[in-house]
C-alpha cells in the first residue's frame, strides 16, 4: 500500500481496532480488533537505547501485575532514532536476552516486527496515534533535539521524538494519552488503574 493510501486509512480510522501488525516471532498479522475491551499500552522500543533496561523491565512489570486485569502491553521495535534497533527481526529477542537488558531477560508482552513510526513509511497505527494525540501530555514541546538524527520525511510537528514514547489506549480502542520518552513506563500505572477500574467497554 502506498504512503498516500496508508495516510488516508489512518485518517479514516476511529480506533486502533482498524489496524494490525505482524508478531516479531512471525506468523499471521494480529488484528488489534482482537484486543477489544482491553486497555492497551503501546510503545516504540529499541534494544540499544540508554533507557532500554529501564523501559523493557517496567513494561514487563506492568504486564505481569496488570495483565490479569485487562492490560495488554504492545512493543514496536523501531530503528529511526539513532539506529538503536539495528538488529534484524530474528535477532532482537537474543539481543534482549543476552545484551540489554540481558541476564536471560524475556519480554512477557507482545512484540511486533520492526516498523517506522514517522515519515512516509510510518506504520498506519502510529500515523493514527500521532494524529489522535499530537504531543505528549507531560511535555507538549517534545521534539527531536538533534536535526542530524532526523532520517525520515516528511517531518511533522506530531512526530514521535525518540525511543519509548508511550500511547495509552482505552478499552474502546480510542487513544487517551501520550507520554514522552522521559516519562517512566511504570509511572503510567495510576492512569492504567483508573481505566481498569471502569470495567470493560461494550464498544
Swiss-Prot record:
Modified residues (Phosphoserine): 34, 197, 201
Site positions per UniProt: Subject to oxidation and hydroselenide loss to dehydroalanine: 49
PTM text: During periods of oxidative stress, Sec-49 may react with a superoxide radical, irreversibly lose hydroselenide and be converted to dehydroalanine.
N6-succinyllysine PTM positions: 88, 114, 148
Any GO BP annotation: vasodilation
Active site: 49
Broad class of where this protein is predominantly found: cytoplasm
InterPro entries the record matches: Glutathione_peroxidase (IPR000889), GPX_AS (IPR029759), GPX_CS (IPR029760), Thioredoxin-like_sf (IPR036249)
Transmembrane domains' residue ranges: none
The keyword Coiled coil is assigned to this record: no
Catalytic activity: 2 glutathione + H2O2 = glutathione disulfide + 2 H2O; a hydroperoxy polyunsaturated fatty acid + 2 glutathione = a hydroxy polyunsaturated fatty acid + glutathione disulfide + H2O; tert-butyl hydroperoxide + 2 glutathione = tert-butanol + glutathione disulfide + H2O; cumene hydroperoxide + 2 glutathione = 2-phenylpropan-2-ol + glutathione disulfide + H2O
GO molecular function, one term: phospholipid-hydroperoxide glutathione peroxidase activity
Location of this chain's protein in the cell: Cytoplasm; Mitochondrion
Tissue expression notes: Expressed in platelets (at protein level).
Subunit structure: Homotetramer. Interacts with MIEN1.
Protein name per Swiss-Prot or TrEMBL: Glutathione peroxidase 1
Taxonomic lineage: Eukaryota, Metazoa, Chordata, Craniata, Vertebrata
